[in-house]
Amino acid sequence: MSIMGRIKMSVNEEQFGSLYSDERDKPLLSPTAQKKFEEYQNKLANLSKIIRENEGNEVSPWQEWENGLRQIYKEMIYDAFDALGVEMPKDMEVHFAGSLAKAQATEYSDLDAFVIVKNDEDIKKVKPVFDALNNLCQRIFTASNQIYPDPIGINPSRLIGTPDDLFGMLKDGMVADVEATAMSILTSKPVLPRYELGEELRDKIKQEPSFSNMVSAKKFYNKAIKDFTAPKEGAEVVSVKTHIMRPIDFMLMGLREEFNLYSEDGAHLSAPGTIRLLREKNLLPEEQIARIESVYNQAMSKRFELHAEHKKEHDEMPYSDAKAMLDEVAKIRELGVQRVTRIENLENAKKLWDNANSMLEKGNISGYLKAANELHKFMKEKNLKEDDLRPELSDKTISPKGYAILQSLWGAASDYSRAAATLTESTVEPGLVSAVNKMSAFFMDCKLSPNERATPDPDFKVGKSKILVGIMQFIKDVADPTSKIWMHNTKALMNHKIAAIQKLERSNNVNDETLESVLSSKGENLSEYLSYKYATKDEGREHRYTASTENFKNVKEKYQQMRGDALKTEILADFKDKLAEATDEQSLKQIVAELKSKDEYRILAKGQGLTTQLLGLKTSSVSSFEKMVEETRESIKSQERQTIKIK
């Protein structure tokens, strides 16, 4: 039986005899077959000799071996098709995988390869040829420990088919190790001068959702960090392959995927090719590139030496001899941690972008501004630039409706600045205006939906008043949450302006002059604005009877057990917000009646001093509330007079 099973061949017995037969069936070769067999052995021996005699050559021994073996194996393929009388399909591709694809193979590494054909009918035609080639490689391995065709690994007799066939084998789990096989295919390198089918197969793997995490940059980095860890303390020996080469391999795979490094000849798949592209594109600091390159070359030199010494794959070496390389690999793993962190930061930034874009699509202006501000703050905190995030958004779109809002916001930038200028820096983060405008410009740069022009939706009108209300609602949302009094001052001021604009809209009196009047209005000092002379964010003065929510369960949770003047200030601020909703005398009376029926009003009416309680005097906070009501009533009357005058 052959490695993959007995095969039937139409070999010209006089010319090649048993060259392609299973050596267990026919251990002896005919003279003609023996001559051809020795020819292949001599080519391998000469290649080994060239490598040893060319020390100091610019090309490394492992690169020299991979280049030379590719030529020998290519010749073996052509010879086998000729000998078996099979016409080679013109589109057939053979790909090296594993160490051969990555230019890491030594004289004693396995021969990992697979075959891709264009049509299903070609599979039956070419499979017997690669069965025969496997028999030949097995015979060579028996003689010299070289080019072993692993029967359960990436084997050209087992892994053969169209791109759809091979992809189906992966998806259906019909290979020994799906993840390892997928990675081997993704890092494979063509033996013959054709690669289009390989690209098609790689694209299928990358685009398959169930494989996306398996072949992502983050996955590769984590394998370097978590799967191929440093040897245990006290270990006497280490594996050059497992403890040094594998972490570097997966780091380079992660870098190739993250930066989308590619070259048509497949050179990017080797460590030297990846390192060259990293350096050419200036993608990492030179110190980090040089470290990877240095450790890789040291490890490969040692691996080549060990394999030659033992005349087989042998990767173990004393821990003490490997210590310096292991220390450098630890630093390379640290780079992996940095890259994973950066990827996760970009993933989170992308989610924040999606949230902001969703708000645009809904026409929620204040929601968009808040989400865009969160994105800006996150990117600033994580030291991310717009150009870092832009590639992550290549498949994202902004609708014409969203674009219309962005344009209107951009046009209202100066008005936005005036609205924010009425507040102190304690309520609005410095640079907030420029930050959000900057993010709006960034959003406007993103492409629109397919086939849509970069113009706003002409049927979606965004009035200036709507934009300004959205801006002021946003300013309310970003008021400093750690300072309740300042937050309420901001809320009250913005509510006042929002209510004023809404009244202008109801009276059909929106124009640049009236909007400017609203924008330019400023709030009085906090104590005057809240009409409560003891306004404070602390519990306030010492009292015989401190106001609390103890007997008012309905409001206890809302005010988080605040006490004293701070509690009354908080309640007054909320009442101020509610009064701002009144549009006429009737609605004002209804709101006042509603507020007086609440537990909060009873807290305002409860005296904190002994005299106030004994004599049942009106508290200063109730007086403040009454003053608020009168101010609101006067504001309504003033607005009504202005409306009549304009009409």
Curated annotation (Swiss-Prot):
<dbReference type="InterPro" id="IPR048718">
    <property type="entry name" value="SidM_Rab1_act"/>
</dbReference>
<dbReference type="Pfam" id="PF14860">
    <property type="entry name" value="DrrA_P4M"/>
</dbReference>
<dbReference type="GO" id="GO:0044161">
    <property type="term" value="C:host cell cytoplasmic vesicle"/>
</dbReference>
<dbReference type="InterPro" id="IPR038346">
    <property type="entry name" value="DrrA_PI4P-bd_sf"/>
</dbReference>
<dbReference type="GO" id="GO:0070273">
    <property type="term" value="F:phosphatidylinositol-4-phosphate binding"/>
</dbReference>
<dbReference type="InterPro" id="IPR028057">
    <property type="entry name" value="DrrA_P4M"/>
</dbReference>
<feature type="region of interest" description="Protein adenylyltransferase/guanylyltransferase">
    <location>
        <begin position="1"/>
        <end position="339"/>
    </location>
</feature>
<keyword id="KW-0964">Secreted</keyword>
<dbReference type="GO" id="GO:0005576">
    <property type="term" value="C:extracellular region"/>
</dbReference>
<keyword id="KW-1036">Host cytoplasmic vesicle</keyword>
<keyword id="KW-1043">Host membrane</keyword>
<keyword id="KW-0344">Guanine-nucleotide releasing factor</keyword>
<dbReference type="InterPro" id="IPR033784">
    <property type="entry name" value="DrrA_GEF_Leg_pneum"/>
</dbReference>
<protein>
    <recommendedName>
        <fullName>Multifunctional virulence effector protein DrrA</fullName>
        <ecNumber>2.7.7.108</ecNumber>
        <ecNumber>2.7.7.n6</ecNumber>
    </recommendedName>
</protein>
<keyword id="KW-0067">ATP-binding</keyword>
<keyword id="KW-0511">Multifunctional enzyme</keyword>
<dbReference type="GO" id="GO:0044600">
    <property type="term" value="F:protein guanylyltransferase activity"/>
</dbReference>
<dbReference type="GO" id="GO:0018260">
    <property type="term" value="P:protein guanylylation"/>
</dbReference>
<dbReference type="GO" id="GO:0005524">
    <property type="term" value="F:ATP binding"/>
</dbReference>
<dbReference type="GO" id="GO:0005085">
    <property type="term" value="F:guanyl-nucleotide exchange factor activity"/>
</dbReference>
<keyword id="KW-0808">Transferase</keyword>
<keyword id="KW-0547">Nucleotide-binding</keyword>
<keyword id="KW-0548">Nucleotidyltransferase</keyword>
<keyword id="KW-0446">Lipid-binding</keyword>
<dbReference type="GO" id="GO:0044162">
    <property type="term" value="C:host cell cytoplasmic vesicle membrane"/>
</dbReference>
<comment type="function">
    <text>Virulence effector that plays a key role in hijacking the host vesicular trafficking by recruiting the small guanosine triphosphatase (GTPase) Rab1 to the cytosolic face of the Legionella-containing vacuole (LCVs). Acts as a GDP-GTP exchange factor (GEF) for the small GTPase Rab1 (RAB1A, RAB1B or RAB1C), thereby converting Rab1 to an active GTP-bound state, leading to the incorporation of Rab1 into LCVs. Also shows RabGDI displacement factor (GDF) activity; however, this probably represents a passive activity following the GEF activity.</text>
</comment>
<dbReference type="Pfam" id="PF20851">
    <property type="entry name" value="SidM_Rab1-act"/>
</dbReference>
<comment type="similarity">
    <text>Belongs to the DrrA family.</text>
</comment>
<dbReference type="GO" id="GO:0031267">
    <property type="term" value="F:small GTPase binding"/>
</dbReference>
<dbReference type="InterPro" id="IPR048717">
    <property type="entry name" value="SidM_N"/>
</dbReference>
<dbReference type="Pfam" id="PF20879">
    <property type="entry name" value="SidM_N"/>
</dbReference>
<keyword id="KW-0843">Virulence</keyword>
<feature type="region of interest" description="Rab1 guanine nucleotide exchange factor">
    <location>
        <begin position="340"/>
        <end position="520"/>
    </location>
</feature>
<dbReference type="GO" id="GO:0016020">
    <property type="term" value="C:membrane"/>
</dbReference>
<dbReference type="GO" id="GO:0043087">
    <property type="term" value="P:regulation of GTPase activity"/>
</dbReference>
<feature type="region of interest" description="P4M region">
    <location>
        <begin position="544"/>
        <end position="647"/>
    </location>
</feature>
<dbReference type="GO" id="GO:0018117">
    <property type="term" value="P:protein adenylylation"/>
</dbReference>
<keyword id="KW-0472">Membrane</keyword>
<dbReference type="GO" id="GO:0070733">
    <property type="term" value="F:AMPylase activity"/>
</dbReference>
